[in-house]
Amino acid sequence: MPLMKFKPTSPGRRSAVRVVTPDLHKGAPHAALLDSQSKSGGRNHHGRITVRHVGGGHKQHYRIIDFKRNKEGIPARVERIEYDPNRTAHIALLCYVDGERRYIIAPKGLKAGDQVIAGANAPIKTGNTLPLRNIPVGTTVHGIELKPGKGAQIARAAGAAVQLVAREGIYATLRLRSGEMRKVPVECRATIGEVGNDEHNLEKLGKAGAKRWRGVRPTVRGAAMNPVDHPHGGGEAKAGQGNPHPVTPWGVPTKGYKTRKNKRTQQFIVRDRRG
């Protein structure tokens, strides 16, 4: 997909870069697969901010995505590729031969009119879903389950791809985009191919307002705050942070400090993403 730049009629348009998507559906989404969403503004049930930089943004309907692909052995035709405001990837509307319609994450190269199928004996073709034990080593996949039957959890964003590098016993070894090598049960399902809209990372919003449309509020530096608001705050004029290492607003070291606590799944990580 080509990139589109704009005439510099304003500072915001001067630096904006958009991905041209002529193949996307121009009309409304499939109404039966929509659900309502309410905004919290980053507040919990007490009304206190628990997630910073969240608030505002355009109203959106949630698109119900089929992450499980549990309609086995029934072929489906791709009706159209659609935009989804809730994720960076595009979505594909499938129409099964029995008349049911479902949304899936659109893989790269999938287009209207293509046929896909899910099942243990599905052919190795873009958009098809099958267990890792039946996928050849070296194949690029996305939408991978971490537990059999739970639904896709890994590699769902635009341009995401994972390579199946080995299979031994009840586990398959995957190489993630981050460099991490991870073991996953061979009964877990994955979809062939990589996620589409892979040029999403080349987009530039161009102005702060485009970020606000997406529900993202400004991020303020700690050094620009008062001492009551942040450990880096206070001081006369542009003072240093006053700490031997930079910290979060709650005093936890940042910039490289490991915060992962889930030792239960550490055994499945063969190689850390940091090398």
UniProtKB/Swiss-Prot annotation:
<dbReference type="Pfam" id="PF03947">
    <property type="entry name" value="Ribosomal_L2_C"/>
</dbReference>
<dbReference type="InterPro" id="IPR014726">
    <property type="entry name" value="Ribosomal_uL2_dom3"/>
</dbReference>
<dbReference type="GO" id="GO:0002181">
    <property type="term" value="P:cytoplasmic translation"/>
</dbReference>
<protein>
    <recommendedName>
        <fullName>Large ribosomal subunit protein uL2</fullName>
    </recommendedName>
</protein>
<dbReference type="InterPro" id="IPR022669">
    <property type="entry name" value="Ribosomal_uL2_C"/>
</dbReference>
<comment type="similarity">
    <text>Belongs to the universal ribosomal protein uL2 family.</text>
</comment>
<dbReference type="Pfam" id="PF00181">
    <property type="entry name" value="Ribosomal_L2"/>
</dbReference>
<dbReference type="GO" id="GO:0003735">
    <property type="term" value="F:structural constituent of ribosome"/>
</dbReference>
<feature type="region of interest" description="Disordered">
    <location>
        <begin position="224"/>
        <end position="275"/>
    </location>
</feature>
<keyword id="KW-0699">rRNA-binding</keyword>
<keyword id="KW-0694">RNA-binding</keyword>
<dbReference type="InterPro" id="IPR022671">
    <property type="entry name" value="Ribosomal_uL2_CS"/>
</dbReference>
<comment type="function">
    <text>One of the primary rRNA binding proteins. Required for association of the 30S and 50S subunits to form the 70S ribosome, for tRNA binding and peptide bond formation. It has been suggested to have peptidyltransferase activity; this is somewhat controversial. Makes several contacts with the 16S rRNA in the 70S ribosome.</text>
</comment>
<dbReference type="GO" id="GO:0015934">
    <property type="term" value="C:large ribosomal subunit"/>
</dbReference>
<dbReference type="GO" id="GO:0019843">
    <property type="term" value="F:rRNA binding"/>
</dbReference>
<keyword id="KW-0687">Ribonucleoprotein</keyword>
<dbReference type="InterPro" id="IPR002171">
    <property type="entry name" value="Ribosomal_uL2"/>
</dbReference>
<dbReference type="InterPro" id="IPR005880">
    <property type="entry name" value="Ribosomal_uL2_bac/org-type"/>
</dbReference>
<keyword id="KW-0689">Ribosomal protein</keyword>
<comment type="subunit">
    <text>Part of the 50S ribosomal subunit. Forms a bridge to the 30S subunit in the 70S ribosome.</text>
</comment>
<dbReference type="InterPro" id="IPR014722">
    <property type="entry name" value="Rib_uL2_dom2"/>
</dbReference>
<dbReference type="InterPro" id="IPR008991">
    <property type="entry name" value="Translation_prot_SH3-like_sf"/>
</dbReference>
<dbReference type="GO" id="GO:0016740">
    <property type="term" value="F:transferase activity"/>
</dbReference>
<dbReference type="InterPro" id="IPR022666">
    <property type="entry name" value="Ribosomal_uL2_RNA-bd_dom"/>
</dbReference>
<dbReference type="InterPro" id="IPR012340">
    <property type="entry name" value="NA-bd_OB-fold"/>
</dbReference>
